[in-house]
Amino acid sequence: MLTAKSDSTKTDYAKVTKGGKIDTGLFTVIYNNKSGKLYFELPDSAFHRQYILANRMAATSDTQDFVAGQMINTPLLIQFSKDERNVYINLIQSNNVVDKNDPIAASFDKNFLNPRMKGFKIAARNNGNVVIDVTSFFGTNEAYISPLKEVSVFSKLFGDANAIKGTFSADASSIDFVKTFPKNIEIESTLSFNTTGMIKKPYSVKVHRSLFVLPEDPMPMRYQDNRVGFFNNNKNIYSSSKDKVESKT
């Protein structure tokens, strides 16, 4: 039985790597130009770190909503987790924080669980590493990193009611390139849509996604300053020593 399992594991890994280019960096990336398939091979160490996933417009066929170089949304703070079947991307709830030594920390953790944003079936295993297919995440109109503006009641109030809307065109979309480095992975994709507004036309964008690992020893938080060009967000600070939640930026 052990031999059969080992043979099956080797066969699965051979399938995902066949014809693909294997690059090592932040973690191993397997990209097949012919099939368009993109795989991440994650070691156990990848599941103990936090990452930033940034989503930027690299080029566009219509500047109504975004121009080249503009951030599409607020960068996501994420972490990978896994079970026997799947790997998950968890969205870290960084807006709400508490000191880990505070008496309310245990209760806080139960009420601010980091939600699972996306799940990937484990496609293969290799020497303790797990391999997942991330083609659809980076090569299709994934909701959390979509280049289409989300229309809501608030967006209508701020003049975004006429944002470009469209249906995703899979046959006109592709992952263009993948580059790996020791601390980051860069992925650029062309995503195409058929607009569904008053004027129906093709709409294509090139989106650049950056996945980079954060330091194991986090930098101390500081107040937001427009003179410093780093990402910032609001913090709701919970404490048993105060009778209200303190908000800071």
Locations of the language-model features?
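Auxiliary tRNA-acceptor-end handling modules of aminoacyl-tRNA synthetases
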Residues: 2-249
